[in-house]
Each structure stands twice: as C-alpha cells, then as structure tokens.
C-alpha cells in the first residue's frame, strides 16, 4: 500500500485515493480552510447519530468561520492533522491526531479521534482514516498514538485492535450519556 503522507516543508500533508475492501473509492486529504462549513455540518450529523462521541451537537460552539480557522491551523502544523474522507464528493468522515502536549515528557504522544457518518459504517472508511492517521503520526515522529473508546462500541474496538492498538485501562464512568447513563471508556494505545 502506497503512503499518502507527503513531506511538505515541515507541515503534515496527506492526499490519497484508495479503494476499500468493500470496493468503495475514498479520497482522503487534509481538511483546509475552505472545508469549514462542510466539516462543521459533518460534525453535527455524526455527533447526532451516535452516543459514542465525546460531545453532542448542541455543545459545539464553533461556527463555520471558526472551523475554517481550526482547519487552517492544522494545515500549517508540523505535528497535528485533520483528515477528511470523501465518497462521491461527500464528506463521509473525519479523523485527526492532536499532540498531547509540547512538554518533553509527553511530546512523544498524540491523541487520535475519528467520526464516520452512520451510512458509511462498516465500509472500510474508518479503517482507511485510521491507517492514514497512523502514517501521519509516524511521520511526525510520535512514539505512541492514544484513544478512548466506549466499551459498547465493539465494531470500533475490533478495528482499533486490527490496527494494532491495545487496551491499557478502563474508566467505568468515563462518559455520562444523556440516553444511556454512565458509559465505560476503554483507553487504548499504539506504539509506533
């Protein structure tokens, strides 16, 4: 498999079109400022469709202009990235890596996050975005990629394990859902 990561003068750059195991053509690339409104719309849709993400749509205080600035910041970052997966020109999902911190003791660690529109679940887009973020994290020099996942989200846990992530802890009351009460979070990490 060809890497989509490119060295772009100290900036994280990713651009690749792939065909998933299910035969879906997916274009994955950096989110850029002009994507602000479509990424924001995708955020609201994905966060309304599932109880597995950290926030609810009504808790988001970003507008399209702020989302554009956020994406622009990511485009110019040497060690953080926000990727968008497109299927037939439509945003199917987003994923990204964020530095845990700049301090020496934690500079080797990054956090991974992902959200996929429900209509695209099980089609390989999550796997493709996860693999792309792993490539980018390695290229940025991280030694460890981390995530939290709701324990009931068996499909995501299986995908993360297939990608090499291992469980290192649990928080029985990690999330408090409006619908399900407390949800257990599993902390996972991938050594790069």
Task: Describe the function of each predicted region.
Residues 130, 137-148:
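Conserved GNAT acetyl-CoA-binding A-motif
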Residues 146-149, 161, 166-182:
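Conserved catalytic-core motifs of GNAT/GCN5-like acyltransferases
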Residues 10-24, 179-192:
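Terminal substrate-recognition subdomain of acyl/acetyltransferases
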Residues 26-38:
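A short beta-loop-alpha structural element at the N-terminal edge
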Residues 123, 127, 139, 152-170:
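Conserved active-site alpha-helix within GNAT-family acetyltransferase domains
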Residues 22, 41-58:
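Helix-loop element at the rim of GNAT/NAT acetyltransferase active sites that forms part
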């Amino acid at each position: 498999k060809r890497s989509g990561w490119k060295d772009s003068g100290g900036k994280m750059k990713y651009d690749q079109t792939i065909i998933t195991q299910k035969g879906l053509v997916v274009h994955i690339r950096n989110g850029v400022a002009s994507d602000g409104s479509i990424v924001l719309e995708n955020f609201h849709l994905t966060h309304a469709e599932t109880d597995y993400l950290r926030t609810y749509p009504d808790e988001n205080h970003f507008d399209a202009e702020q989302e554009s600035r956020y994406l622009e910041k990511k485009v110019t970052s040497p060690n953080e990235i926000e990727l968008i997966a497109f299927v037939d020109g439509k945003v199917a999902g987003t994923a990204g890596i964020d530095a845990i911190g700049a301090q020496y003791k934690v500079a080797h660690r990054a956090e991974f996050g992902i959200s996929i529109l429900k209509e695209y679940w099980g089609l390989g887009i999550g796997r493709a975005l996860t693999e792309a973020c792993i490539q980018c994290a390695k290229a940025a020099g991280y030694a460890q990629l981390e995530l939290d996942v709701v324990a009931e989200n068996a499909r995501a846990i299986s995908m993360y394990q297939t990608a090499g992530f291992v469980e290192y802890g649990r928080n029985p009351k990690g999330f408090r859902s409006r619908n399900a009460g407390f949800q257990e979070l599993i902390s996972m990490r991938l050594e790069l």
